[in-house]
């Protein structure tokens, strides 16, 4: 009798994706982050669902409802902090996942990569709208500043902003629609992640060497299920330590002050995972230019496959490209630090130089380095 997992229409899909999937024998722990992102998404949807049962999306009661969740709901504080810090874990995994793709040339799978870039945009939009919901000072002013950027779009800008706000300022209508979008978007993310996997399984996974691994495949289960479980345990440990010992470490104290349209916080800044893009936005004195740079800071990832000039796929055997890659990582850390600093000397010039270097590395220096390496290897 044939095994049910190979014949049943639904079980067959699961089997071909997670059990009998042929995987390269040499993929390292950098390939764990896909499954970790899946776990993060499930955690966020579940904790978010329980939070939504107690949250009210009204400007008068939103802040109080979050306080009520933390004080009066059984383990409400735990659910709330798991959700808030789960977002940070989500982004850590996302950045490492994208970094892995850049380093090992996974972007050569064009469909998978482009869906991934779309996923990154969607997750960022979801996180931004989620940050507005507690209706603290940073929620309100963050929403005001970021939505206001759309007014830089010529001709339709002002109308567009007022349309998004549902009025002439960030108010009840804005909060209600942000809650609605924040609820629906994770399910769109889950659907896109399914498409992401669908395209990945058309080609099979890449591997650290960047060479074809068709001649040496092993079944996903038990080898990579066990390996992924280790990653999941480390993720759960890290998240638990964060939630139980310093839940507010990555948050902003200003968000414990209820939203007040009459009082602007001294330093408006987003959550830590947006600071690099925020620094790029602020480094350009022109409003429209800043908005374009902000969008391009993520959209530039979609150009990476077209900028691949090397004869080799992976950076594993390309020392010059490796140096530039780690310079890019250091640059992103610098941008993240600058994004959290006030707009004054010397932070302004550091931010501008780091922003220029960011785009230079991706668009100019890395493709040139690849060509140099080709010539050094007489290719």
From Swiss-Prot:
<dbReference type="InterPro" id="IPR005797">
    <property type="entry name" value="Cyt_b/b6_N"/>
</dbReference>
<keyword id="KW-1133">Transmembrane helix</keyword>
<feature type="transmembrane region" description="Helical">
    <location>
        <begin position="288"/>
        <end position="308"/>
    </location>
</feature>
<feature type="binding site" description="axial binding residue">
    <location>
        <position position="196"/>
    </location>
    <ligand>
        <name>heme b b566</name>
    </ligand>
</feature>
<feature type="transmembrane region" description="Helical">
    <location>
        <begin position="226"/>
        <end position="246"/>
    </location>
</feature>
<keyword id="KW-0830">Ubiquinone</keyword>
<feature type="binding site" description="axial binding residue">
    <location>
        <position position="83"/>
    </location>
    <ligand>
        <name>heme b b562</name>
    </ligand>
</feature>
<protein>
    <recommendedName>
        <fullName>Cytochrome b</fullName>
    </recommendedName>
</protein>
<dbReference type="Pfam" id="PF00033">
    <property type="entry name" value="Cytochrome_B"/>
</dbReference>
<dbReference type="InterPro" id="IPR048259">
    <property type="entry name" value="Cytochrome_b_N_euk/bac"/>
</dbReference>
<dbReference type="GO" id="GO:0046872">
    <property type="term" value="F:metal ion binding"/>
</dbReference>
<dbReference type="GO" id="GO:0006122">
    <property type="term" value="P:mitochondrial electron transport, ubiquinol to cytochrome c"/>
</dbReference>
<keyword id="KW-0472">Membrane</keyword>
<keyword id="KW-0679">Respiratory chain</keyword>
<comment type="subunit">
    <text>The cytochrome bc1 complex contains 11 subunits: 3 respiratory subunits (MT-CYB, CYC1 and UQCRFS1), 2 core proteins (UQCRC1 and UQCRC2) and 6 low-molecular weight proteins (UQCRH/QCR6, UQCRB/QCR7, UQCRQ/QCR8, UQCR10/QCR9, UQCR11/QCR10 and a cleavage product of UQCRFS1). This cytochrome bc1 complex then forms a dimer.</text>
</comment>
<dbReference type="InterPro" id="IPR027387">
    <property type="entry name" value="Cytb/b6-like_sf"/>
</dbReference>
<dbReference type="GO" id="GO:0008121">
    <property type="term" value="F:ubiquinol-cytochrome-c reductase activity"/>
</dbReference>
<feature type="transmembrane region" description="Helical">
    <location>
        <begin position="113"/>
        <end position="133"/>
    </location>
</feature>
<keyword id="KW-0479">Metal-binding</keyword>
<feature type="transmembrane region" description="Helical">
    <location>
        <begin position="33"/>
        <end position="53"/>
    </location>
</feature>
<keyword id="KW-0408">Iron</keyword>
<feature type="binding site">
    <location>
        <position position="201"/>
    </location>
    <ligand>
        <name>a ubiquinone</name>
    </ligand>
</feature>
<dbReference type="GO" id="GO:0045275">
    <property type="term" value="C:respiratory chain complex III"/>
</dbReference>
<keyword id="KW-0813">Transport</keyword>
<dbReference type="InterPro" id="IPR030689">
    <property type="entry name" value="Cytochrome_b"/>
</dbReference>
<dbReference type="InterPro" id="IPR016174">
    <property type="entry name" value="Di-haem_cyt_TM"/>
</dbReference>
<feature type="binding site" description="axial binding residue">
    <location>
        <position position="182"/>
    </location>
    <ligand>
        <name>heme b b562</name>
    </ligand>
</feature>
<dbReference type="InterPro" id="IPR048260">
    <property type="entry name" value="Cytochrome_b_C_euk/bac"/>
</dbReference>
<keyword id="KW-0999">Mitochondrion inner membrane</keyword>
<comment type="function">
    <text>Component of the ubiquinol-cytochrome c reductase complex (complex III or cytochrome b-c1 complex) that is part of the mitochondrial respiratory chain. The b-c1 complex mediates electron transfer from ubiquinol to cytochrome c. Contributes to the generation of a proton gradient across the mitochondrial membrane that is then used for ATP synthesis.</text>
</comment>
<dbReference type="Pfam" id="PF00032">
    <property type="entry name" value="Cytochrom_B_C"/>
</dbReference>
<keyword id="KW-0249">Electron transport</keyword>
<feature type="binding site" description="axial binding residue">
    <location>
        <position position="97"/>
    </location>
    <ligand>
        <name>heme b b566</name>
    </ligand>
</feature>
<keyword id="KW-0349">Heme</keyword>
<comment type="similarity">
    <text>Belongs to the cytochrome b family.</text>
</comment>
<feature type="transmembrane region" description="Helical">
    <location>
        <begin position="320"/>
        <end position="340"/>
    </location>
</feature>
<feature type="transmembrane region" description="Helical">
    <location>
        <begin position="77"/>
        <end position="98"/>
    </location>
</feature>
<feature type="transmembrane region" description="Helical">
    <location>
        <begin position="347"/>
        <end position="367"/>
    </location>
</feature>
<feature type="transmembrane region" description="Helical">
    <location>
        <begin position="178"/>
        <end position="198"/>
    </location>
</feature>
<keyword id="KW-0812">Transmembrane</keyword>
<dbReference type="InterPro" id="IPR036150">
    <property type="entry name" value="Cyt_b/b6_C_sf"/>
</dbReference>
<dbReference type="GO" id="GO:0005743">
    <property type="term" value="C:mitochondrial inner membrane"/>
</dbReference>
